[in-house]
Design a protein with these regions (language model features):
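Short, glycine/charged-enriched hinge/interface segments at domain edges or termini
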Residues: 1-71, 226
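Residue-level signal for inorganic ion chemistry
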Residues: 31, 62, 96, 199, ...
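N-terminal small/polar loop signature for handling phosphorylated ligands or for N-terminal nucleophile
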Residues: 59-115
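Short glycine-rich anion-binding loops that position phosphate/pyrophosphate groups of nucleotides
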Residues: 36-37, 100-103, 148
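Generic structural signal for buried aliphatic residues
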Residues: 1-5, 11, 95, 236, ...
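A general structural motif
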Residues: 50-55, 75-80, 123-132
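A generic local secondary-structure boundary/capping motif
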Residues: 1-2, 17-23, 86, 123, ...
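Flexible glycine/proline-rich
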Residues: 112-247
Length: 247
């Protein structure tokens, strides 16, 4: 079965005088951020502007798992700008759009995607963070539309995009493996969407962070797991087991 080669694998191949082996190419992924409010890191944000952090976090995540990411220029909130930036993504194995997928006057990604022939497979999921997720196909190119909130984009990258990258690399097509451990504190009842809570696995227990706002990258940066609460889950007590996936 296909596998990702580590240092020992490569040393073993060399010791057996195997100079060449067949491999899967690294999938190319075009990252497309949208929004008039965005500026690139290194630029000075104006009033009501924010830094486009999502593309850099996602590129680091996906490159570390074998992808080859290209960060495209920021697309502004016009059909013409979005179409021009989509054109730069032509030929990629996957296009990831970030932002522009929620309901709103300036959320044009779905409209422009339809204009250029992207076939939408689904839009919106019962999950938090990450409700306004979309996916489709643009010829042979996979298209995934991620939410614009920083934590939402990265959580959806872990849950949905990494399995696609693995499939493109010929690795098993499986969702992130869930584990379980006791809670370090009580957790309130959950609402109608499955909740991927930022948490830390420490000394055999799951410590769920109190603040779970989808804009708080500082909390995600401290987390090493996502604790999973099913939709409509009852309150959980300290010591109850909870499922999680490692980050």
């Amino acid at each position: 079965a296909p596998k990702r080669l580590n240092a020992a694998d490569i040393a073993l191949l060399a010791s057996m005088n195997i100079a060449q082996i067949p491999v899967y190419k690294r999938p190319t992924i075009a990252l497309l951020s949208t929004g008039d409010e965005l500026v690139m890191p290194g630029e000075q944000p104006g009033p009501d502007q924010i830094l486009a952090s999502n593309t850099y976090g996602l590129a680091a995540l996906l490159n570390s798992h074998g992808a080859e990411c290209r960060i495209l220029p920021i697309a502004r909130d016009t059909r013409a700008s979005l179409k021009a930036t989509f054109a730069l993504a032509a030929g990629s194995d996957m296009v990831l759009t970030i932002g522009g997928a929620s309901v709103g006057d300036h959320d044009l990604v779905a409209q422009v995607a339809a204009d250029i022939g992207i076939r939408q497979s689904f839009y919106k999921i019962a999950m938090r963070p990450g409700k306004p997720l979309m996916a489709g196909a643009w010829g042979d190119t996979i298209m995934i539309g991620l939410p614009g909130n920083p934590v939402s984009a990265l959580v959806c990258g872990h849950i949905f995009v990494l399995p696609v990258v693995n499939a493109l690399l010929g690795l098993p097509r499986s969702a992130p493996i869930r584990q379980s451990a006791p809670l370090a504190q009580d957790v309130a009842a959950n609402g109608p969407r499955e909740h991927y809570m930022r948490a830390k696995f420490h000394e055999g227990r799951v410590h769920v962070f109190e603040r779970q706002d989808s804009a708080l990258l500082s909390v995600l940066a401290k987390a090493n797991i996502l604790a999973i609460r099913p939709a409509f889950a009852a309150p959980a007590k300290q010591g109850d087991r909870i499922e999680y996936i490692p980050l």
